[in-house]
């Protein structure tokens, strides 16, 4: 696996997020070796994310109703993929499998913004996973997203899988352009 940064002694939740990037890249490479490619979707990523977060001591809820989102109809509830808490630290994580260089993340970002607004000190992240050839040239059409750390890629000789994580930042914070 390749990454351009040493990750010793990272603070939480950044350490857990780095482990998620490493874990997902290797896990999906393993599934590809098992010829499981037909079943690939973002849902394949849920179990390893849950395992990594719980191994890091987080209490994790999946498919959590998103606070602060108005619901159009009865039963039409927007849900966050993950909400993790540990020692007063809380964050939401939305997961997206990128099949092309330009992906629709509008609903994911709306949920992350609503979560941050409803949860004063909480953080919110978007995990984007896919083939390295796609993630290296990924175009996200959203403001206030800042990449956390470097892209992580499992380079095992066949298809290379990569993972990036972005933090949803408040509009009043300085922004930097990321790919």
Ranges and model annotations:
Residues 103-127, 134:
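Short, charged, amphipathic alpha-helix that recurs within catalytic cores of restriction-modification
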Residues 37-38, 55, 59-88, 156-161, ...:
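Active-site metal-binding core of divalent-cation-utilizing nuclease and nuclease-like domains
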